[in-house]
Amino acid sequence: MKKYKTYQIVVIIIGLFLCFFGRFIPVSPKSMILRSAFTSRRYSGLSASGAQTLFIMVGGLLMWLLVGVDWTSLAVILALALIPELGMNKVAAGTLGNSTVFYLLLCFMLAKSLQATGVAHRLAVWFLTGSFSRKGAWCTIAMIFVSIFVLSSGLSSSSTIMIFLPILYEIFESLGYEKGKGDIFPAVMIASLAIICQIAQATTPISHAMTLIGFSSYNSYTGNNLEFGQYVMVAMPVGILTAIGWFLVCRYVWRPDVSRLSRLDYDAIKGNEGPFSKQEKIAATIYLIVVVLWLAPGISKYLCPPAYPLLNKIHQCYPPIVAIILLHFIKVDGKPVLPYKEAISAVPFSTLLFMGALLELGTALANGDIGVSTWLGDTIGVFCTGVSPFMFIVVLAAMSVILTNFMSNSVTCAICMAIAMPLSTSLYSGLISPVIAAIMITIGINFAFATAPATPPVAIAADSGWISAGRLFKYGAVAGLVGIAVMLAVGLPIANMVC
């Protein structure tokens, strides 16, 4: 049984009380919340169910942030089901029955094919040991960054970091570095592994739970879909330029001593890998076809408008379903390329349940009958009067990046969306497109680089023994500033063109 610290027990008690009994808390009229929730009458525009939804959000975020995302997700789901306007049937359909949750499940299963067949590891080694990488120390570092970026854009950042950690450890040891010595080069590389992973995670929704939460939160508030291709056209340039910016910071600001890389044995890293196996070719080909089908609808809207109506009928779940079935039935040497049981074993169901709970919470906040969205727009709008649309986007972008470095991506997304969506459809209606605000937030919440609580890859880097917490925070903070600058200088203009 998991043992909780004293503060966590206190948080659990407070969180559960807010989730289930928050509506009975008498609140001063000055706070614009219900004095009593024994009745369903409105007070200052907020219903009893609206007040309860806000308390569920506060209680849920507290438990998710300080306790964990396991059983707490079930508690939030139950609390939401007790709201009269929702009920268990709607809540169940909105959590595990959510198409975005199902899509993420399929992504994890499909991504397993790249890991199980060895494609992911081979790709990483190929980048690292190629002819360009051998031209010099900074060429090697550049190719390491490129390989991390490429893999993490299609795999979860946690999977990518687990592929590269053994490779980096092998490099450090072969060059004579030791843990705890405070050498800058290993520290820069370990920090960069987490940073590039997170940057790439922001570029596509493929196997990226937090990016998909941004997609679904936008849908919950507006009823519209954020297109795959539309998002990638904005996020990919931002990600690439942010990664390049970080590389330049590493080379010209941190300036680690890279002289030892001249002794790196590339052939030893490459090992005895033979040519591409038939399984690898099949898995890689099918995966690439799926990615093309995901991108086709959004891109065709701009490059080939006549084809858009047809391609737009391809739901994002269709390609991976077909791919997973094919990989199960296509056999090489009498064995499936990816057996179904092996594919399903790659699915982190606790993550899916957490994601479903968070999405349903967003749906409840946006529910017109409950009225929280309207109330938030009116309440927060008072503080935004006189703030220009551009400055509002600047604040959103900065807030999403800053908050996500001190709390989980999902909590940051919930907070930022709860502020941005109501205001972009009320105070800034016609001035700020909700989809642009959603894209900026979704990119920003992935730029979690500075602290261990921010995201699992950063926690792994912090616990590696190759970098101190202080240095990781400094590197992550600078990377965050680079990300904000690129989001506003490049991402925002592109978003205004394609959205």
Question: What is the meaning of each model-derived region?
Answer:
Residues M1-Y103, Q230-D378, V478-I484, A489-C499:
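Hydrophobic transmembrane alpha-helices of multi-pass small-molecule transporters
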Residues R42, T72-L78, L82-K179, I344-S345, ...:
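Membrane-embedded alpha-helical segments and adjacent helix-loop junctions characteristic
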Residues G59-L66, A116-G130, F329-Y340, A398-I402, ...:
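C-terminal ends of transmembrane helices
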Residues G60-V69, S147-S157, I195-P205, F329, ...:
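Transmembrane alpha-helix interface/packing and boundary motifs in multi-pass membrane proteins
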Residues I83-L86, A116-A120, T129-R134, I171-P186, ...:
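Juxtamembrane helix-boundary/capping and inter-helix hinge elements in multi-pass membrane proteins
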Residues L104, A137-V150, Y177-A200, L226-V234, ...:
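Alpha-helical transmembrane segments of multi-pass membrane proteins
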Residues S158-E173, Y177, D183-N219, V234-L264:
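Transmembrane-helix bundle segments that line or gate the permeation/cavity pathway
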Residues A209-Y231, L261-D265, P456-V478, V490-C499:
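Transmembrane alpha-helical segments and their short flanking loops
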